[in-house]
Amino acid sequence: MDAIYFFLTIALAVGLTMLFTWFKKNNITLKWNEWVLGILGLLLALFAIQHTYASATYEFEYTSAWIVGVIVLLLAVVPLLFAARSVRRRVDK
């Protein structure tokens, strides 16, 4: 197991903990569809990171690593933006 996965797990745990404490502090609740969109975006982002790292490190395919990584990261941003927009619209009311 590479060290990148250890540090990625630590960063993910710290980031999610900070996000949940910020939600509690600002009294923000999420609906079920916002949870689904957030988890989908997070999984796509993790897939992009893992694919880019594995393709570049083990297969030495830098071009395909970056092309697929960028495409999947762009796809990961879409559900996260929809969830953030939905929460912002509800909180502003």
Curated annotation (Swiss-Prot):
Alphabetically ordered keywords of this record: Cell membrane, Membrane, Transmembrane, Transmembrane helix
Induction details: Cotranscribed with vcrA and vcrC.
Membrane-spanning intervals of the chain: 3-23, 35-55, 64-84
Localization terms from the record: Cell membrane
Cellular component per GO, a single term: plasma membrane
Extent of the signal sequence: none
Topological relation to the membrane, as annotated: Multi-pass membrane protein
Source organism, top-level taxon: Bacteria
Family assignment from sequence similarity: Belongs to the PceB family.
Function of the protein: May act as a membrane anchor for the chloroethene reductive dehalogenase VcrA.
Protein name: Probable chloroethene reductive dehalogenase membrane anchor protein
UniProt organism field: Dehalococcoides mccartyi (strain VS)
